[in-house]
């Protein structure tokens, strides 16, 4: 955790319950785990990854004037196996946006890029688990030219990428209707 904070990341904690719409957008086609008695439609399924909470926090902060964001979350996700047995997995996820540094009176700094995100992920991995390769990613909500699966020692340990412009537009439109 301290390594992420030393890179300027702020930790968030989001609900493990998300909307079906968020699951359909970010759930990577995984089976939903419906809540028997949800508090609201926005909390009707258990999350299968942490992306929804990060993106919703990002949009909230963006609407309140925060362009430059570095967020991370460590949280539990929930899955069902073919036998309908439920299991829980702890994951870590992060998000960066805006400029590399805050602008000052003298100069404007460059926007963060895919490579800044890749560097942040690489810094988080231990020396024994450095990224061994990146392979093209086919996750629907990510931009196809700016996304990759992360492999450490031939094991897929995650993904990184930029949100697809169509997904981002959909999120902004949905968020505007909700507020």
Region annotations inferred by a language model:
Residues 177-179:
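N-terminal low-complexity segments that are often proline-rich with Ser/Thr-Pro
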Residues 3-175:
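Extended beta-strand-rich architecture
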């Amino acid at each position: 955790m301290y390594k992420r904070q030393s890179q300027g990341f702020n930790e968030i904690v989001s609900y493990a319950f998300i909307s079906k719409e968020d699951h359909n957008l970010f759930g990577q086609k995984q089976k939903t785990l419906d809540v028997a008695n949800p508090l609201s439609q926005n909390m009707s399924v258990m999350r299968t990854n942490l992306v929804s909470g990060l993106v919703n926090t990002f949009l909230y902060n963006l609407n309140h004037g925060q362009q430059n964001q570095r967020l991370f979350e460590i949280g539990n996700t929930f899955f069902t196996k073919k036998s309908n047995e439920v299991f829980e997995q702890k994951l870590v996820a992060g998000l960066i946006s805006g400029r590399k540094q805050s602008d000052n009176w003298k100069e404007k700094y460059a926007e963060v890029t895919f490579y800044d995100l890749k560097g942040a992920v690489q810094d988080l991995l231990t020396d024994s688990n450095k990224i061994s390769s990146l392979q093209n990613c086919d996750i629907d909500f990510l931009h196809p030219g700016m996304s990759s699966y992360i492999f450490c020692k031939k094991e897929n340990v995650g993904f990184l990428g930029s949100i697809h412009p169509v997904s981002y537009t959909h999120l902004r439109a949905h968020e505007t209707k909700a507020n």
